[in-house]
Amino acid sequence: MFLRSLFRPPATEMPADAAAGPGAVRWRPLRRVLIWLRWFGLRALALMAVLVAIYALVNPPTTWTIVAASRSDPISTRDWVDIGDIAPVMRRSVVAAEDANFCLHWGFDMSEIRKVVASGSSRGASTITQQTAKNVFLWQGRSWPRKLLETIYTPLIEALWSKQRILEVYLNVAEFGPGIFGIGAAAREFYGVTPAQLTARQAARLAAVLPAPKSRDPNRASARSRAIADGAATIARDGRADCL
């Protein structure tokens, strides 16, 4: 019954228009378009919310990014890893690298956005929640339609998932190298350990490759990985890692 009412076409007949005069009749097609747009928009939003709610409990089996990557690279075996089985230092490292204020905001880091706008920088200010929305529900690449959908998905995820669930899903679908998706595959392929056994140095190096997983090597130390290790220690001290 709910689904039937959800997808029932909107009533677009407006008999009162004919009595209102020719002006009202002239605007009738536009009003019908607006009614249909509102009907479609509300149904699309409802379906997005349902999908987000499902993935609050069910682990995403795959993503568009993984499917696309499988056409050019063999995909390493990807076993889902619960957040409790990921080393705390790995959780802190990825937050320090990608979204230091992850525990403090509701999907959009407005202070970081203001910094980017003020500096005129071309670098992004996407939070881990925004990246999770893109990686799980959408596609890669820059486009206004994708960014719009990401902006809708982000508050839905924040409302329906816990912070730990967001980070768990993010770490299980993120790409760490060509064909290497998820922290379980990354820890095994690069270091021969489980995610729970990752050291601070290994965690920092894995987090360092996330912006460019196809071109960066997690077996090599870098200034970025050292900065991430320092950042992970900092957010552990100042309380910004309390939600992890």
Predicted features and spans:
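Juxtamembrane regions of bacterial inner-membrane/periplasmic proteins
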Residues: 2-244
